[in-house]
């Protein structure tokens, strides 16, 4: 009698050499639960998605460069017999950072945010006085890995004018005040499988930088005993997301008197399986239960 295993595709990119990915750590636990796993570049054109029972979006870290093709791939998966995690509806909701304003309306504290669909140098320059800050952050509404993210200083704006116009002339973008605690303390990531908190880490930028991603020199530290107020904030955010998600990452920074939501990552976040030895098994078990 043949042992028919379930098959799972883990979506990635064809070249991870410039990235830090730890998704290989979930393969052994998944195999132990009866799954066959295969890493597949998301833009591969020769895949029959009906060959798989489940497809999990993982390290698809160039999708923002080919957004239409990315959606076409996900639509093909959802039209097949395979189940997509997280679902296409979740991706559509989460891919544009306009969702932050939706969460703010649900009483989630976010970094003050202004959204624009066209670039006007004078309007952006006026935001220094609007926010009463001398540093701002500007980034696309659809972005990943801190791509096309800039720190703006009022005294240096004129030097960046042509770069900003070239970068944002054809894309939606947001502007926020720069939160100093990103440099001094760092950014917290709370990682959930289902609605269960798995682990918490603190990501700090290298000296002279503001980006906390490892690819930019960021340093990771596991927080074994996170403050109860941080957990409460993360749980509150999770309770306002209008979908049930297999995996979620809530990125948070400490404000002057409370925590502020930076982003909710529901598409292809690094889940930092390397930072908690129990997390790969926990992920596999939650996934197996969800799919069962």
Segment roles from a protein language model:
Residues 2, 6-12, 74-79, 88-185, ...:
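Active-site nucleotide/adenylate-binding loops and adjacent lid/helix of ATP-dependent enzymes
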Residues 61, 146, 206-207, 265-275:
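Glycine-rich phosphate/pyrophosphate-binding beta-alpha loops
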Residues 41, 175-177, 245-256:
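A short glycine-rich, hydrophobically flanked beta-strand micro-motif that places a catalytic Asp/Glu
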Residues 242-245, 254-292:
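C-terminal active-site "lid" helix and adjoining low-complexity regulatory extension at the edge
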Residues 60, 114, 141, 178-179, ...:
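Anionic group-transfer/hydrolysis microenvironments
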Residues 14-117:
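Conserved N-proximal alpha/beta basic substrate-recognition cap immediately N-terminal to
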Residues 52-57, 189-192, 258-270:
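A short beta-strand motif that forms the metal-chelation/ATP-contact edge
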Residues 147, 153-238, 253, 260:
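Phosphate-binding site of ATP-dependent enzymes
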């Amino acid at each position: 009698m043949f042992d028919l295993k379930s098959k799972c595709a883990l979506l990635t990119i064809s070249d991870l050499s410039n990235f830090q990915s730890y998704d290989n750590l979930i393969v052994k636990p998944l195999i132990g639960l009866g799954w066959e796993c295969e890493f597949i570049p998301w833009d591969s054109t020769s895949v029959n998605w009906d060959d798989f029972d489940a497809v999990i979006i993982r390290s698809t870290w160039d999708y923002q460069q080919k957004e239409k093709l990315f959606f076409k791939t996900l639509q093909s998966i959802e039209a097949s017999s395979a189940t997509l995690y997280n679902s296409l509806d979740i991706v559509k909701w989460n891919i544009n950072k306009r969702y932050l304003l939706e969460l703010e309306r649900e009483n989630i504290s976010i970094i003050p945010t202004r959204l624009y669909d066209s670039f006007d140098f004078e309007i952006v320059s006026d935001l220094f006085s609007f926010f009463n800050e001398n540093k701002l952050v500007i980034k696309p509404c659809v972005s990943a890995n801190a791509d096309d993210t800039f720190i703006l200083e009022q005294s240096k704006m004129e030097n960046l004018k042509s770069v900003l116009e070239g970068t944002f002339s054809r894309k939606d973008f947001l502007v926020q005040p720069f939160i100093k605690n990103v440099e001094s303390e760092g950014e917290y990531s709370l990682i959930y499988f289902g609605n269960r908190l798995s682990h918490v880490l603190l990501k700090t930028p290298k000296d002279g930088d503001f980006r906390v991603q490892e690819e930019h020199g960021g340093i990771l530290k596991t927080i074994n005993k996170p403050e109860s107020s941080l957990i409460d904030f993360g749980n509150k955010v999770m309770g306002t997301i209008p979908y049930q998600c297999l995996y979620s990452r809530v990125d948070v920074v400490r404000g002057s008197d409370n925590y502020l939501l930076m982003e909710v990552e529901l598409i292809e976040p690094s889940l930092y399986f390397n930072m908690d030895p129990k997390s790969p098994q926990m992920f596999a078990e939650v996934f197996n239960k969800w799919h069962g």
